Amino acid sequence: MEKEWKKLIDEVENNRSYSSEPNFKFVDFIREKSTIEDKRAIVQEVERRIKLLMSMGLKNVIMTDRKGAIYEGREGLNPIKEEMAKITNFNKEKGTLAEVIKGADIFIGVSAPGTLTQDMVRTMAKDPIIFACANPVPEIFPDEAKAAGAAVVSTGRSDYPNQVNNVLCFPGLFRGVLDARASDVNDEMKVAAAYAIAGLVSDEELTAEYILPAAFDPRVKDAVAKAVAEAARKSGVARI
């Protein structure tokens, strides 16, 4: 784990803000008229994703590692965790994952198999959303999470609904970069890619087991490429 963090130190991006409004349709589907700003999220060691989510409106975030909640002043934090402690967990909540997850609306994990238990899910807010994306064995399997009360569950696996796979993003993102001859791949372009992917699931199609298109949906590449190229132009990094 420490080796992974050392590798990430060179990849820390500046936290930026956006004027565009996020469309978290799956959240609204589960909680009528709710907004992402109202939600409390527990995120396991995915610094870059946390910054992007926070820039899109998610405010109440607690980042955890194998020692529990990360908070400002915790001893033994490496530079990247010290940085994250300054912009997350403003109440300086302390404790293990099992302790800080109580009452949380969302869990996002890209960590290790079996780190989220059914007992933990039962202590979360009503109808929690679980992204258990460790591969090949997730933090918790979908059937276990749903039996414990989860409303929406995503994993990185193709044999379960709501697969989160980076193949949804990369082909179209790089096509958009090339089409715009972009000098950078900035956060605005990443956000645009996310919106484009989410937008391919219509309100009529949206269910708890279909919140994003399939990994090899032929519509995805072109939709993402168009959105990314446009975002590159609007953010000033396009060269054509």
What are these regions (language model features)?
Residues E82-A151, R157-D159:
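Rossmann-like adenosine-cofactor binding region
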Residues K51, S55, E99-K102, Q118, ...:
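A broad, structural surface signal
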